[in-house]
């Protein structure tokens, strides 16, 4: 009985895992509106359905209501693992026309410029983005929608390109690892049989977008001979198929490694997989950061007499990136009433100081107003907020000492003890010297 319960629990767990994530992805079909800009129409991807018929969608054009068949499983697997609390993904569909790759280094993928007849027909490019993934898929829909029992169009996934790190954040000076995977299934048996058994040749391209232009960082065509552009900035890619099944489907890896990231390397990265006449591309946004260090001067005590202003306080905020988004706040903690409040006084910030590693530093200044006796023991704090820090920020503080209201400090007590110890030793030494001299005089008198 226990084993039956265990099997039931495992089955329920597996069913939950399989059914996780959205079953339907709402999309927008985007097309050119005959010179009047872009037109958008609603569509949807039905990734899976329960028992029975697909849910009817009378609000959609049947050609844009797609029941997705994914032989390689990459598209559906990405959404089975989609976190429940994550925002809904943004999805766009558009027409796609199979063409040879335009880059010269990828010309070996398509020796014949004419697209094979096996790739004729309608194609759709689906681009999906969210905080947890960026995905591009090529779908081949059936020519006509299925009429019964629900108006819906069957579509087969041919190529999927995917990253699970669409917005990587890398600490300044550390290596960036941008993951990329892809999956391919030949669209027809004729297309598969026209090629040699095993996965087809492919091209991998990584670019960084800068001022509207793509800067090529790395290009590779594993298994093909030919002159390739040299990799830039020490970039390396793990470009290979994961398996060598004779007829597919196949999965591959195009993960990108960039060493010792600097600020100029942040921005938009475009990863493209080229197959013969087919392409898929995803976008990643790389952000570089370095959390600031904070220190306060004077470091321990700020002394002032009643009615006098304490010395100027200097908050050093050092070696951080990016330079924007920094806030410096001054607080008075433990003042009258024991509460924390915004510190009064004149405050200003210095200009940014730039360092060789791309980070910056600045200093915040506060000239407090004259103090009162009630403020003795209060603490001035410099709190900083920066995009690289938690919401609470980071702070440093110094204690305010009002003259005449405090007993001797620990340092003073230690000094007094040492002084007393030295005086005691001196007195004892003088006493021993006096006794010695007296003894010597008595000895001389007896000798005479």
UniProtKB/Swiss-Prot annotation:
Residues annotated as domain Ig-like C1-type: 292-399
Keyword Endoplasmic reticulum: yes
Disulphide bridges: 27-91, 315-382
Gene Ontology MF terms in the entry: MHC class I protein binding; MHC class I protein complex binding; molecular adaptor activity; peptide antigen binding; protein folding chaperone; TAP complex binding; TAP1 binding; TAP2 binding
Topological category with respect to the lipid bilayer: Single-pass type I membrane protein
Ranges per topology, Cytoplasmic: 436-448
Tissues in which the UniProt entry reports expression: Neutrophils, mostly in fully differentiated cells.
Listed transmembrane segments: 415-435
InterPro entries per UniProt: Ig-like_dom, Ig-like_dom_sf, Ig-like_fold, Ig_C1-set, Immune_Resp_Modulators, Tapasin
Gene Ontology CC annotation, any one: endoplasmic reticulum membrane
Entry's disease: MHC class I deficiency 3: An autosomal recessive disorder characterized by glomerulonephritis and markedly reduced cell surface expression of class I HLA antigens. Additional features are herpes zoster infection and polyps of the stomach and colon.
Function: Involved in the association of MHC class I with transporter associated with antigen processing (TAP) and in the assembly of MHC class I with peptide (peptide loading).
Domain comment (free text): The N-terminus is required for efficient association with MHC class I molecule and for a stable interaction between MHC I and calreticulin. Binding to TAP is mediated by the C-terminal region.
The protein's name: Tapasin
Organism per entry: Homo sapiens (Human)
Gene giving rise to this polypeptide: TAPBP
